[in-house]
Amino acid sequence: MIYDHNAPGYQKVYQQMGAGRWNGAYYYSKELVENIIPKVKTDRDWVTIYVLGMFCDHSVYFIHNNNSQAMYAPIKLYDDVVLVCGVPSTVPKVERYARAVYLPLSVDVEYVRQFKRRKTRGVAYVGRAGKRRNLSFAPDVDFLEGMPRDELLEEMSRYRQVYAVGRCAIEAKVLGCEVLPFDPRYPDPSLWQVMDNSEAVPILQGILDEVDG
């Protein structure tokens, strides 16, 4: 069974998010369900996105929030859960709840590449507005926020430099943008290596094979 972005519990919240619905967790969940999970052999259930109360035994659970790990505390009440983290530093923060592993973030490279455009603009911040709270940027920085993904990718592609983290940073690199750091937790943009969804499949398969012996 797969609990994902289509689950009624998530959709109820999703419809109330406004511009916040265009978030990385939603699109990563879509790619997990479409491009990765069907190619991984396991008898475990899957949880690809966070919804309060949506946990289950013997499952693979994808962690999206690297800031507020306490939200995942209820997982410790469930048996045999594997927590998949997209950032190495998150692993030790959540392993008190269940077995935690690191799977590098990946994107659908070919899908992103179709939005590549000529570079005609300078610098932009790309991501949710909340991630830049209490941070200051130069006056010439544009802000690409609250946009549907395809529109965002096309706009981002026109910039030479982009402030971004996570999958957004990987997408920027696919589009030929130079990624600049802005989050003090991730001072080195080289953390965000370009990896296609297909490359993540054997890594995740190997992790689960090792876990399940």
What are these regions (language model features)?
Residues 140-198:
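Donor nucleotide-activated moiety binding/catalytic core segment of transferases
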Residues 189-213:
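A charged, aromatic-enriched C-terminal amphipathic alpha-helix characteristic of glycosyltransferases
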Residues 2-93, 190-192:
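Extended catalytic core of nucleotide-activated donor transferases of GT-like folds
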Residues 1-4, 13-16, 118-130, 162:
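Short hydrophobic beta-strand segments
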Residues 78-83, 121-123, 158-161:
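Short active-site oxyanion
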Residues 90, 96, 102-151:
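Conserved catalytic-core segment of nucleotide-activated headgroup transferases in glycan assembly
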